[in-house]
């Protein structure tokens, strides 16, 4: 990938593994997208975000979460991190978590690690993936329209008529995913379900030459839908999948650090890359760290809204706490310990099962090297892989508490092995 695009997304601002990760992005690297976001916020005065809640609104919409933690979540979600171009989001994560870590590092593909109690044992990996589903520029036609490829599980149906940003070497270009009005859509029989190859982006240019001055083949594209409070503890955004995971592992380090309780284990909080396109980053960093046990955090499907079959997908509700998953990649002894600390800490847990794979980084971690004992903790999420994912922040707050309690429960002699 070209160096100037890496510069624009900030990759070269992150030091190599073993160095302190305190470098800052400069104004040129931040580019035009940040200016676009700022102006968008000013235009949309009805958006409720933790940085703009007045006293009256706060009374109407009480937020239980610590203000700094909520602001961190908002910044993580609002910072574009298209899969395989996660660097800007990784910088946000590192800047926050370094206050609670002994050391922060990253590898060549941008998988970031914050280590607490280095040299302790056993080694625990707490992992969430930093990337989000995205599109990329595939073709520019003679009229300047951009045609795209999918990066991850983008739903073409909900993508139409969305505002997007094409991330170029200078920052970002505003675009619209085109959609003919209903008056002009001819339907014979059943309506046609759109495919990714049907999507085109209008950036306001009328020729290929004009568009090529602004974007190029391979530029990543993300939807412009930022964090908002929907009502009380309910929030909506694109990319809660899986900023809630990277937020959770960072907050776990904070809780452990601030508790000042004795810690035996070495904690490696991980913000890994490229989950949405093959679980690649988790596989890379799990191999490098070689942990004794791993907890993976991701979203799961809430099934508490119309049109979803509980018989097929289980009974998972928002507001009832995170879930623990049973089966396959989830080691029974790790799951048992998670359940025990949840009971002791009075943290509500819901239960779900998998029949083959979980579709998360747990699938990659558990068979890395000789097999790393792992478990999946998930946050119920409505409307996953859409621009309007909805989660309960009270559920989210339970996850770092649960992982922190798990980490603090570990003794130096503990091992996770099936009892035979």
Where do the language-model regions lie?
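N-terminal hydrophobic/helix-forming segments and targeting peptides
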Residues: 10, 33, 39-420
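Short linear motifs in low-complexity or flexible loops
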Residues: 1-2, 6-16, 21-24, 30, ...
């Amino acid at each position: 990938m070209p160096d100037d695009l890496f510069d624009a997304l900030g990759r070269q601002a992150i030091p190599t593994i073993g160095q302190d990760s305190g470098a800052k992005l400069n104004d040129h690297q931040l580019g035009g997208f940040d200016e676009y976001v700022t102006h968008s916020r000013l235009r949309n005065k009805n958006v409720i975000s933790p940085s703009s809640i007045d006293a009256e609104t706060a009374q109407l919409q009480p937020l239980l979460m610590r203000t700094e933690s909520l602001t961190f979540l908002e910044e993580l979600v609002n910072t574009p991190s298209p899969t395989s171009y996660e660097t800007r989001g990784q910088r946000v994560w590192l800047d926050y978590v370094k206050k609670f870590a002994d050391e922060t590092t990253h590898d060549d593909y941008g998988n970031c690690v914050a280590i607490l109690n280095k040299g302790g044992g056993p080694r625990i990996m707490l992992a969430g993936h930093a990337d989000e589903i995205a599109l990329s520029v595939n073709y520019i036609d003679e009229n300047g329209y951009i045609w795209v490829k999918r990066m991850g599980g983008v739903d073409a149906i909900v993508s139409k008529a969305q505002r997007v940003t094409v991330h170029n070497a200078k920052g970002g270009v505003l675009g619209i995913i085109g959609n003919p009005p209903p008056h002009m859509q001819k339907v014979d029989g059943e309506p046609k379900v759109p495919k990714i190859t049907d999507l085109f982006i209008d950036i306001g240019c009328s020729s290929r030459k004009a568009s090529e001055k602004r974007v190029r083949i391979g530029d990543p594209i993300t939807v412009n839908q930022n964090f908002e409070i929907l009502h009380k503890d309910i929030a909506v955004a694109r990319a809660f999948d899986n900023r809630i995971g990277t937020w959770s592992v960072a907050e776990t380090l904070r809780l452990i650090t601030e508790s000042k309780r004795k810690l035996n284990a070495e904690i490696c909080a991980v913000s890994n890359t490229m989950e949405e396109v093959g679980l690649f980053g988790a596989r890379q960093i799990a191999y490098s760290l070689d942990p004794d046990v791993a907890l993976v955090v991701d979203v799961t499907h809430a099934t508490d809204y119309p049109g979803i079959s509980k018989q097929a997908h289980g009974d998972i509700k928002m507001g009832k706490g995170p879930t623990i998953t049973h089966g396959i990649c989830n080691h029974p002894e790790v799951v048992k310990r998670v359940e025990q600390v949840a009971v002791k800490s009075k943290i509500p847990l819901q239960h779900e099962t998998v029949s083959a794979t979980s579709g998360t980084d747990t699938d990659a971690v558990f068979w890395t090297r000789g097999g790393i004992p792992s478990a999946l903790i998930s946050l119920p999420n409505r409307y996953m892989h859409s621009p309007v994912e909805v989660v309960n922040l009270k559920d989210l707050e339970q996850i770092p508490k649960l992982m922190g309690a798990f980490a603090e429960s570990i003794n130096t002699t503990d091992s996770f092995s099936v009892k035979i």
